[in-house]
Curated annotation (Swiss-Prot):
Its EC number is 3.1.-.-. Gene3D superfamilies: Hypothetical protein af1432. It is a single-pass membrane protein. Coiled coil: none annotated. The gene is rny. Residues 193-253 form the KH domain. This is Ribonuclease Y. The keyword Hydrolase applies. It is found in: Cell membrane. The keyword Nuclease applies. PANTHER family: RIBONUCLEASE Y (PTHR12826:SF15).
Length: 503
């Protein structure tokens, strides 16, 4: 028991000794560690202080350099200000001297003005004594003389300016017109009233005439033309002042000759076919003209009337070619003057559009042209250009004036017009117009310069006993209205057909 207690005591003592030793060792290790950390902290502190001192020194150096730079700038600016100030002082001194000189001159000028005024007053008084006129009267007389002289000079200058302006305007207008005429050229097509149809041989003439002349009479009656079958070999002449009727008849006869079937029924049928074809041709011609001139917004009916002008002549001049030429000349002049060239082109093309229908309707070509232009939506400038190109009304725009000038240029070209043919056509139209105005007559055709007249009477409203009265009325009307040289023959045709169709 005592041993155990002794062992326990020894063990406890040993444990205590070990703990003491461990504590001592631990304390020493901690102390060494702390001393190391303190040393490292001191080194870090020294490094931080060193870096801080270095950075402060660098900033201080930079600041001192900047400060010195700013000081230098201030010194330079100060020097510049001093220089400018010195310059201003010198300039001010110069200005003061100049002002003093001006003051001296002004003083001298005032003295001279006063002397001049005194002398002027003295001179006026002496003049009043010499001339027995007051200064007001003398001034009025002087003004009168000056005004008279100035007025004369002004009138002379105005007259000179007007002469120069007229000369310049004439030269300019001549250049514009010459330029327009040189730019466009239109062939002159002489008017004719006959077409020649070539035959394969002279035996065909018998076919054309037909039994007892039936084919020839039917053809002439339905076509409204005269067919001349004479001794000219292998040729038949179709005569009519109406170019469309003449063209339809020519095409019909040529087609019948190809088919080799010439008889009244075939003639009537082929005439209707050719009438339809000529209408299509007229429209095609109209659209060709529109393409040539660059017009793409014209009413179809107006386009058709333009095409119809190809078959119309005036004083021997083809109206379509004339209208196209007028359009181009008017467009060129308008372009030179800075006006609406497209509007001038359109107005020039349509200025004679009434001639496409004046042989079908009553009225002048101007009146009819205005009527159709307004009907198919042309604007007032175009309408006035049509209405005014023969001076029937006043021209309301520059375009109307240009169209009238272009029309005159085209018409006045050498060889462009033939008055004798135009007079002949006017006479033939008048004969047909008089005949168609008589009640009972449905169609009138004039041939051989009006010496041969064929009238077709309405078989429903007239009978055979009325023919003599109708012819007498026509004869008297023609005598009173138209001068026709030579002997006149009037043939009246009354034909009634009755067709019965049954099963």
């Amino acid at each position: 028991m005592g041993i155990i207690i002794g062992l326990i005591i020894v063990s406890v003592a040993l444990i205590i000794s070990l703990c003491s030793l461990l504590y001592i060792l631990t304390s020493k290790s901690q102390k060494v560690l702390n001393e190391k950390k303190i040393k490292e902290a001191k080194n870090e502190r020294k490094k931080i202080l060193s870096d801080t001192y270095r950075e402060i020194n660098e900033q201080k150096k930079s600041f001192e350099e900047n400060l010195q730079f700013e000081k230098n700038k201030l010194e330079i600016a100060k020097q510049n200000i001093e220089n400018e100030n010195n310059l201003l002082i010198k300039e001010r001194a110069i200005i003061i001297k100049q002002q003093e000189a001006i003051d001296v001159k002004n003083t001298d000028l005032d003295k001279r003005i006063k002397n001049y005024s005194d002398k002027r007053e003295e001179l006026i008084k002496r003049l009043e004594i010499i001339s027995n006129m007051t200064s007001f009267e003398a001034k009025a007389e002087l003004m009168k003389n000056v005004e008279s002289k100035i007025q004369y000079e002004i009138v002379s200058q105005i007259k000179q300016a007007e002469n120069l302006a007229h000369a310049r305007a004439k030269e300019l207008s001549n250049n514009i017109i010459l330029s327009a005429m040189e730019r466009f050229k239109t062939d002159i097509v002489n008017e004719k009233t006959t077409n020649l149809v070539k035959l394969p041989n002279d035996d065909i003439k018998g076919w054309i005439i037909g039994k007892d002349g039936r084919n020839l009479k039917t053809f002439e009656q339905l076509a409204g033309v005269e067919i001349i079958v004479d001794d000219t070999p292998e040729v038949v002449t179709i005569s009519s002042f109406n170019p469309i009727r003449r063209e339809i008849a020519t095409k019909t006869l040529e087609k019948l000759l190809i088919d080799k079937r010439i008889q009244p029924i075939k003639i009537e049928k082929e005439l209707k076919v050719q009438e339809k074809l000529i209408d299509e041709t007229i429209l095609e011609i109209g659209y060709q003209v529109m393409d040539e001139l660059g017009i793409h917004d014209m009413d179809k009916e107006l386009v058709k009337l333009v095409g119809k002008l190809k078959y119309r002549t005036s004083y021997g001049q083809n109206v379509l070619l004339h209208s196209v030429e007028v359009a181009k000349i008017a467009s060129s002049i308008a372009s030179e003057l800075g006006l609406n060239a497209k509007q001038a082109l359109r107005a020039g093309l349509l200025h004679d559009i009434g001639k496409a229908i004046d042989f079908e309707k009553t009225g002048s070509h101007v009146f009819l042209g205005v009527e159709v232009a307004r009907k198919y939506g042309e604007d007032e400038v175009i309408i006035n250009s049509i209405e005014a190109h023969h001076e029937d009304v006043a021209k309301e725009s520059e375009i109307a004036v240009i169209v009238a000038i272009a029309d005159a240029i085209s018409a006045s070209k050498p060889g462009a017009r033939n008055n004798s043919i135009e007079d002949f056509i006017v006479r033939m139209k008048e004969i047909e117009k008089i005949g168609n105005s008589i009640p009972g007559i449905s169609k009138t055709y004039a041939f051989q310069a009006g010496r041969q007249i064929r009238v077709i009477v309405d078989p429903v409203t007239t009978d055979d006993k009325d023919l003599a009265g109708i012819l007498e009325t026509l004869k008297n009307d023609l005598k009173n209205s138209v001068i026709i040289p030579g002997e006149i023959t009037i043939t009246a045709i009354r034909e009634k057909r009755e067709i019965l169709v049954f099963n």
